[in-house]
Regions:
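A short beta-loop-alpha structural element at the N-terminal edge
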Residues: 1-15
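Conserved acetyl-CoA pyrophosphate-binding loop and the N-cap/start of the following alpha-helix
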Residues: 87-99
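Conserved GNAT acetyl-CoA-binding A-motif
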Residues: 102-115
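Conserved GNAT-fold acetyl-CoA-binding loop/helix
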Residues: 18-43
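Conserved beta-strand in the GNAT
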Residues: 55, 62-70, 77-82
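Conserved active-site alpha-helix within GNAT-family acetyltransferase domains
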Residues: 94, 115-150
């Protein structure tokens, strides 16, 4: 079942994000890796900035995947899409993404690490198109609040694609 996460589920969101983000270790630039990947303070800041997390519950009512949305001006950003490693490959991420993308008529943008080929492939398989490097820089500077180093090492995918 997919539902909005409750405020008292921040510990579960934190655990899912950091368990799944272990896949980035040694893949993303070393200067961008943190342990934990997302601190509790960063999670609280993301929620305060308007990221609304939805979660996927297993049959026992436990969250096994989370994905956030953040409306910013004229687009919606998909933020922090993570599924527990033991639950990956079972369609959880795809179901979350499909659910969240049907909730808006705005263009949807997703930023991820340029070296996270599995993530890029996942989004492409769900109809997202990677934008040009020039447009990527402009979009990341306009819609995200991230350091220049992260802009340089990221990609953006869009749906619908830019003409």
């Amino acid at each position: 079942m997919i539902r909005l996460c409750r405020d008292d589920e921040r510990d579960a969101i934190f655990a899912i994000v950091n368990a799944a983000a272990e896949k980035y270790r040694g893949v993303i630039p070393a200067d961008r890796w943190h342990d934990p990947y997302m601190s509790r303070e960063e999670l609280d800041g993301e929620i305060a900035a308007g990221v609304a997390f939805s979660g996927y519950e297993d049959g026992d009512g436990q969250l096994i995947g989370v994905m956030g949305v953040q409306p910013v001006r004229d687009v919606v950003l998909i933020r922090h899409a993570y599924v527990l490693p033991a639950a990956q490959g079972r369609g959880v991420g795809g179901k979350l993404l499909a659910h969240l993308t049907t909730e808006t008529s705005e263009r949807i943008l997703i930023g991820t690490w340029a070296t996270a080929e599995w993530a890029i492939g996942f989004y492409r398989n769900h109809g997202f198109v990677q934008v040009t490097p020039e447009l990527k820089d402009r979009l990341l500077q306009t819609y995200w609040n991230i350091p220049e180093r992260q802009i340089a090492t990221s990609v953006v995918l869009a749906k619908p694609p830019f003409e």
